[in-house]
Each structure stands twice: as structure tokens, then as C-alpha cells.
């Protein structure tokens, strides 16, 4: 699973979700319940964030989860939905293409490449439309309070505490030698 980093309380310093699941140039459209739609020319809620990026820029899974939808959705074009624990779902739309290894039911980890930026569906140019759902409510991915990743496993907490104390003692000895 790679390296993980924890604070002195055993809490993971990494978040459970990536706020922006790709390398992007700028935000071309913010979360806005009263946005003027650029193609339909009428007020229509924009329930996500549009990250402008070059076509075929890799799109990563924002967090660990299971692909609950992969295919085309009206307006969104090529779309992926991922269900995460805690009643959270993320949506990725206007994609150029999907990672060919993925299908509905595939498990993904945070940072896995799931697709590539495009302009499928009703889009004015290449970008990722990204939504973050809590239950049935869409929230602003830029402003939502993201949960931390899992803390130190309870079965490893004693070992973690012992290692922490050992390293704190070493730091204190070093500081005493340096300043003493």
C-alpha cells in the first residue's frame, strides 16, 4: 500500500480523498447552484467543479472505493462513479476514455488512474467535471471538509507508541548533545 505517515496520536496525516483528482491548469467553473449554462444558455445548477486540463490528462480515483457506474450519461458523456465508504460517492465526467482494465464493480485505490480528460457530452472544451456526494447531497469538492485516511491499525497501536517513544527519546538526546 506504500508508505503512510501518522502524527504522534496515530492519526493519518493524509486525507481519505484527493481534492483535485488530476493535474489541472485552472478551475474553469466552480460549484454554483445558479450558474448560466454555457451551452443551454439558461440558469442550471452546476453541482461540481470543472478542472480545465489538456486532453488525455490522467484522472485519478479521489479515494478508495468501488466503481458503481462506468459508461455514458446524458449531458456528462463518458462518466465514472465511485462509491466510497461512509455514504460518499464521487463522479468524473466529460472523459475522453476509461482505463481499459476497469468495469463496474472494480475496486480502486486513491491515486489509481481511472480515465483521461476529454470533452464528451455537453462540454465546451477538455476538462474534468468532478462531483463529491455525501449521501444524496452534492457538495462543493473545493470546500468540503475531507476526512482523514485511516489511523494506525489498533492491532499495531502498541508497536507504534513504542516506536514513537524511542524516536522522541533519540531526538531529545540529540538536542541535549547539540545544546549542552
Spans of features found by a protein language model:
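Short, solvent-exposed mixed-charge patches
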Residues: 177-180
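Catalytic cores of peptidoglycan-degrading enzymes
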Residues: 13-166
